[in-house]
């Protein structure tokens, strides 16, 4: 989810909307045991008026298309806009996981789903010749990722 930047959103981007898949929201807030979701519940309460839940068949503002990428979290999402694919937390160690998507970070909630999702999304990116950017990738210039990191 969006835990690290929550106060920036609340204090500096008061008019911002936070788009969260219904599966992600439901997984954290309604299905997760109380002893595991206390922080998420508090954060969602802080920004509840800014949250917009979406379905995966929706197109988000600016023509952004959400794609299912479950495993890291209950409703993890990657986002496509033209030839850019933002993969969020799908990859935590690019030097290892691009070559070995079967290796999981301890943060992945469902390891089997994470592995399957990484394989599917990386193949999708390669087949569609997409630029790939992620939250834990070591370069900030997404153009660095076309082909070179996505191809095996």
Provide a role label for each language-model segment.
Residues 63, 82-83:
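Beta-strand-connecting loop/turn residues
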Residues 12-68, 113-129:
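Metallo-beta-lactamase
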Residues 1, 18, 69-72, 79, ...:
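Divalent metal-coordination and catalytic microenvironments
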Residues 7, 22, 29, 94-95:
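Activation segment
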Residues 1-12, 75-79:
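Di-metal (Zn2+ and/or Mg2+/Mn2+) metal-binding site signature of metallo-dependent hydrolases
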Residues 3, 28-29, 141-143:
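Short catalytic/ligand-binding loop motif for oxyanion handling, primarily in non-cytosolic enzymes
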Residues 62, 72-75:
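Short acidic/glycine-enriched loop/turn segments that link adjacent beta-strands
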Residues 83-152:
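Cap/insert and terminal regions of metallo-dependent hydrolase folds
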């Amino acid at each position: 989810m969006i835990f690290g930047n929550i106060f920036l959103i609340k204090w500096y981007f008061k008019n911002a909307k936070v788009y969260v898949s219904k599966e992600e929201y439901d997984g954290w807030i309604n299905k997760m045991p109380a002893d595991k979701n206390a922080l998420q519940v508090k954060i969602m309460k802080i920004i509840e008026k800014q949250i917009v839940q979406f379905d995966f068949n929706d197109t988000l503002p600016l023509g952004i298309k959400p794609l299912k990428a479950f495993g890291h979290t209950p409703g993890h999402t990657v986002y496509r806009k033209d030839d850019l694919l933002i993969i969020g937390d799908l990859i935590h160690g690019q030097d290892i996981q691009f070559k070995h998507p079967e290796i999981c970070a301890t943060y992945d909630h469902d390891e089997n789903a994470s592995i399957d999702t990484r394989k599917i999304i990386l193949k999708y990116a390669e087949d569609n010749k997409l630029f790939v950017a992620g939250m834990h990738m070591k370069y900030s210039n997404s153009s660095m990722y076309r082909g070179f990191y996505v191809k095996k």
